[in-house]
């Protein structure tokens, strides 16, 4: 997830939609005050090749306690609850969604990266690909 004050946009990251690749690409254009959330270790190493790393995703109160935390797949409502209304109302907000069939294939390979003891059509028929997965990005946007 990225909030760019420099370019006035909010990128909300959905799952299984190349969100990490988009986040890595966008991160290199971010300014020092922008919010960039952490991603996994291997992808973070790639992002740092472009000179950016996670920043400003935690805020602390005067006693040093965390009170605002932005994270990878934070929902639009959670962001809206944290940021100032003027930012929410004036920044361009976007995310990406994927063709449902392509997304199912991607999730199948994600679910079974090495051992594909269950064939794709069987995986679909036996509800391994559930409605909760089909709908799991809806709360992000």
Stretches found by the model and what they are:
Residues 1-141:
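Membrane-interface amphipathic segments in extracytoplasmic regions
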